[in-house]
Regions:
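Short His-Asn-centered micro-motif
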Residues: 10-12, 105, 177-180
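Gly/Thr-rich phosphate-binding beta-strand-loop-beta motif of the actin/hexokinase/Hsp70
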Residues: 96-126, 267
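Hydrophobic residues at beta-strand termini and immediately following loops
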Residues: 10, 36-39, 67, 141-143, ...
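Acidic two-metal-ion nuclease catalytic site recognized across multiple nuclease folds
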Residues: 87, 268-282
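Mg2+-dependent endonuclease catalytic cores in nucleic-acid-processing enzymes, primarily RNase H-like
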Residues: 74, 78, 126-253
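ASCE P-loop NTPase helicase motor core
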Residues: 1-59
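ATPase catalytic-site recognition across NTP-hydrolyzing enzymes
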Residues: 43-108
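A short acidic (Asp/Glu
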Residues: 19-21, 114-115, 184-191
Length: 282
């Protein structure tokens, strides 16, 4: 700018945020920025029919932000809907057969009531006739991270047991664990002890929760993720509250709201991304 030059700033809108400089530049004309609005449909190299297939089934607000390049006010919006997880308005039976069963683990460091818990969700993946998931079971506990070394083998055993029930053609894939904090220790111990455990891609775990939710929204909204009757009806006491914590955390997640219980929510996001994404969760 000292040489009378120009500056270009480009990005995808991310919510309505008066403190965000990109939002200010696009909406406060007194700042002097000239706006170039480029929704995906304006790209001449993209086939309109292909774009229609891409956005089909995605939540309207996701389409508005990610594809129409508009600023969306997410405040107060429950992101996931119960109907998306049901088939004809009801949870589903365990699959008669599937390709594999795997679990996804979110680890806590401390076991006090005010701290996060440790959680696991087990999924069945079937690629026929097209890739889809069934949530088989879930668990959430309040325990110090040190003692997870005794719990993880039990959760791995459950993945094996569920793979037998669901006649998994490729057997169990094991457990996917966040590669950070307590998870690093568990992955190292698992390698030494021969556990069937794998790290969740660090690029995926480093994304904000909102970005991870948007990342899987198309799969969930289009009916590629179903919840089993067992997981739907399950009630567990956790933090002095007895209820279905999986449904509560997933369905009551609100973008932009702080201090939400998210142990099972994280497992849900990672599990869907790993099962239906590109292998690295995207």
């Amino acid at each position: 700018l000292d040489f009378d030059g120009d500056a270009v700033m480009a990005g995808t809108p991310k919510g309505v945020d008066d403190e965000n400089f990109f939002y200010q530049a696009c909406n406060d004309k007194s700042m002097g920025w000239e706006e170039h609005h480029a929704p995906t449909a304006a790209n001449p190299t993209i086939n309109p029919a292909a774009l229609a297939r891409i956005i089909d089934g995605r939540p309207p607000l996701v389409v508005q932000q990610e594809y129409n390049a508009e600023f969306v006010d997410w405040r107060g919006q429950n992101f996931f809907k119960l109907d998306w997880l049901l088939e004809n308005g009801a949870p589903v039976d365990y699959p008669f057969s599937c390709d594999t069963v795997y679990g996804v683990v979110d680890c806590a460091q401390k076991g006090k009531l005010q701290n996060d818990g440790s959680a696991c969700i087990w999924f069945a993946l079937d690629n026929l006739p097209s890739p889809h998931l069934v949530i088989l079971d879930w668990d959430i506990i309040q325990i110090d991270g040190y003692f997870l070394k005794d719990v993880v083998p039990q959760w791995e055993g459950k993945a094996k047991h569920l793979s037998e029930i669901c006649r998994a053609r490729m057997g169990p894939t094991g457990l996917f664990i966040e590669d950070k904090a307590t998870g690093i220790t568990l992955l190292q111990q698992g390698a030494n002890e021969g556990w069937n455990v794998h790290p969740v891609n660090s690029e995926l775990t480093s994304l904000p929760k909102e970005s991870r939710a948007i990342n899987i929204s198309g799969y969930v909204a289009s009916g590629k993720v179903r919840i089993s009757k067992y997981a739907f009806d399950k009630i567990v006491e956790y933090k002095q509250s007895k209820k279905n914590h999986l449904l509560t955390q997933v369905l009551q997640f609100i973008i932009g709201e702080e201090n939400q219980d998210d142990d099972l929510f994280d497992c849900f996001n990672y599990g869907v991304a790993l099962g239906l994404g590109n292998g690295e969760g995207f």
